[in-house]
């Protein structure tokens, strides 16, 4: 629960700072829509495919990853998981894509894609090497989509799904 509160507090502080600096905050707000949800579902599956292609060759013979232990020990209820996924998905995509990727676009597409993807991977390293590879694949797919469309809702929705689905599959 502290993660939800800390992300909300940090988001409010960051948005307040950006607003004081004259940044158009409205451009950072994802606009939910049915079409965006469908695209987000496609992004989810596309990221899963890219991640599978990247990670599978390295997965054989690997010891249990830290993320596997964390998932096995997690005892959150489904409503808490959904709230955490909504807050976390919006928090990460708004700042990594909506702000950082957009701010870096003037330095070229490679920088606008690479820096947010590497920042994303850096704070997911606790998941272990295979988890970091998954995060790299997912982050790159989301960044490519955003660079092409400048739409935030589909990556936010895909991220929310990415955070919820492992718990649903684990419990089924």
Summary of predicted features, one role per range:
Residues 1, 23-88:
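Juxtamembrane helix-loop-helix connectors linking adjacent transmembrane helices
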Residues 1-22:
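Alpha-helical transmembrane segments in multi-pass membrane proteins
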Residues 3-6, 10, 41-44, 116:
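Hydrophobic alpha-helical transmembrane segments of polytopic
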Residues 10-14, 49, 163:
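Helical transmembrane-bundle signal
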Residues 16-17, 21, 49-57, 122, ...:
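Hydrophobic membrane-targeting alpha-helices
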Residues 17-21, 33-37, 112, 131-133:
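Residues in flexible loops and secondary-structure boundaries
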Residues 19-26, 92-96:
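C-terminal ends of transmembrane helices
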Residues 45, 61, 73-172:
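Transmembrane helix-loop-helix hairpins at the membrane interface
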């Amino acid at each position: 629960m502290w993660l939800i509160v800390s992300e909300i507090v940090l988001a409010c502080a960051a948005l307040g700072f950006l607003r004081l600096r004259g940044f158009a905050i409205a451009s950072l707000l994802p606009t939910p829509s049915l079409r965006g949800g469908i695209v987000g579902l496609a992004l989810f599956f596309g990221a899963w495919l890219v991640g599978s292609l990247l990670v599978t060759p390295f997965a054989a013979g690997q010891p249990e990853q830290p993320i596997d232990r964390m998932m096995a020990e997690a005892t959150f209820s489904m409503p808490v998981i959904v709230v955490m996924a909504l807050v976390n998905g919006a928090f990460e995509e708004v700042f990594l894509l909506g702000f950082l990727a957009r701010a870096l676009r003037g330095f070229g597409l490679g920088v606008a894609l690479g820096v947010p993807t590497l920042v994303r991977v850096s704070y997911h390293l606790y998941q272990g090497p295979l988890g970091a590879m998954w995060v790299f694949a997912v982050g790159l797919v989301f960044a490519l989509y955003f660079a092409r469309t400048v739409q935030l809702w589909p990556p936010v929705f895909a991220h929310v799904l990415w955070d919820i689905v492992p718990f649903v599959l684990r419990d089924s």
